[in-house]
Amino acid sequence: MGKKKYLFLIIISLLSKVHAEKIIFSANSMTGQAGNTNTTTYLSGNAYIKTDSMEIQADSIELSGEDYKNIKAQGKVVGKNLEANMEFTCDSLDYNRVTKVAQLNGNVNLDDKDNDVNAKAEIITYNQEEDIAILQMKVNLVQKDNVCSGSYAVYYKKTQILELSGNAQVKKKDDIFRAQVINFDMNTQDIKLGGNVKGTVKDSKEKQNAEQENDLQPNQQNIEENQQSVENPETKDDKSKEAVKGETQ
């Protein structure tokens, strides 16, 4: 019982001399020298680490480099970028505390909470200083009613600009735009297409007609029932006559 409690309470706070950043981490087990920041430290089992700008949970975490500048996480990675207000999940992560660049690998899901943007890809590299994310392979980004996809993308968080390439596509409700390169301003909703441009756009009249057809469908059954009542008035009269006969008897 005492051993389990000790492992659960392994929480070490370090003050980096160079970067003046406090690091807090915990795990079920640890190997390495906690007081020596020039060695590699391994955390395994419910590994957790928190810096001033990043919070990470994973099956295992490795800390290395001078003042533990390199952080590697493996297995069911869940994290938050506290400064950028972004949350993410992935299979593995590499983060450099000095450059503040994080690379998320495998089944990456990234949520930009400030702009209500969700991004998915196999690899996402996020530069915290520049507020720029580079998405690679199976890119899918959703913002409001817009669904954007491609093989490569650059997402500018501050300006809300998205650059798509490689079978690039932007779908805005019923409208679809395809090109080799797409530049999409998510603030103004302006789209610039370049190379092998294709698109399908519904005009306002078509959209209005489609909406009217949808509104008419639920009333169709009532109309048919009313028509049947008008076409067969004798049925109602016969029932009335039978009721009168019954009362007379």
Residue spans for each PLM region:
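Mature-chain termini and adjacent capping regions
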Residues: M1-Q249
